[in-house]
Amino acid sequence: MPQLSIVIPAFNNSRYLPDCVHSVTHQHFRDVEVIIVDDCSTDDTYEVASQLEHEDSRVRLIQHDKNSGTLASRKTGVLASQGQFVMLMDQDDELADGALQKLIDFGNANPADIYHFGVQVVAANKSAQDAAAGMTSFLTPCARTLHDADILKAQFNTDNGFDWHVHHKMYRGDFARTAYSYAADQRLVLSDDLYMSFIFGTLASTYIGIPDSPWYLYHLGRGDTLGTQLTVQSISTMAQRDAQAFSMVGDFAKRDNILPLRNDWHDRLDDVRNRLIEHAMNEWQDNLPSSDKSEGLQNILTHWQADAVCGELYRYIRDYAYAYLVADNRSSDVAINNRKLANQY
């Protein structure tokens, strides 16, 4: 049994896969298995992954016979893993040199279910560079230890929560396999991180945020649309995926075989809902053209309750109005624009 299993779901974008895998296999720490799950790619991902498997016996390739989404790919890989610890990586990211030994040493010395470590954001373009500092702050864990019900209580809290990505975390192996055994057999893409983080947070006994641990190389802007404007269709798709994840979270919370038992499901589900609506509205505000905002808002309202969406609109009104009121020169272009936006919303 290897000390560590690393699961990498792969769908197209094969050009990044070798660097991802080699960032693991070229490390001094050797007691690791790498499980690549090819989700029925339409490019040469299977061939590239097969070559990586041929090069190193620690690499194992599993291929789906149909495209099933990220949740299913991660579930396949984790349930096939054998490691004492388990990690998940995205195929276009990497690990810093020496990260594996540091994580294993920390895990062996500090028993826990979830080990949350930090990132180095590698910006692929100008938009990514502009977003890098904020993303680094968001993905960097506080140095703390949480236990039992406090883990999920903190996870989605707006004041002291932690991010819901499943990568840049190491999990106790049996714990991760149990968590993914609870995962629904539904297609879910992108929003599966939040869904699984809720399950992890529910089942975990101990969470540790590791200080000074920028060991996950997060490639921001690679292969995504960071910095480009959204369309009405894309904002609707995003809201639909998030709403689907929230529905699946609710289904999980209704199960009668979840241990440990808890009596705060309503509050925890409210936390998740509020964070998802905040996310949708921030994307609407920041990345949807003004000409599409009205239609985009109507699409968001088909997935989320009007009172919560109005609460986010009020937040924008408050912020723009405050910026106008405290401006040194209320006749400046910036102040006038803030007043205009406050009135508009």
Name each model feature, range by range.
Residues L276-Y345:
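Membrane-interface aromatic/basic loop that binds lipid-linked glycans or pyrophosphate carriers
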Residues Q91-D212, Y216-I235:
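Donor-binding/catalytic cores of nucleotide-activated saccharide
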Residues S205, P214-R222, T228-P260, H279-D307:
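Catalytic core of nucleotide-sugar-dependent glycosyltransferases
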Residues N12-H26:
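Short, well-formed alpha-helical segments that are part of the catalytic scaffolds
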Residues P2-S5, E33, Y195:
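Cell-envelope/extracellular polymer assembly enzymes that use nucleotide-activated donors
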Residues H64-S81, L88-E94:
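Glycine-rich, basic loop-to-helix element that forms the pyrophosphate-binding segment
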Residues S23, D38-E47, K66:
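A conserved acidic beta->alpha catalytic loop
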Residues D31-C40, R60-H64, D90-Q91:
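Short beta-strand/loop segment that forms part of the nucleotide-sugar
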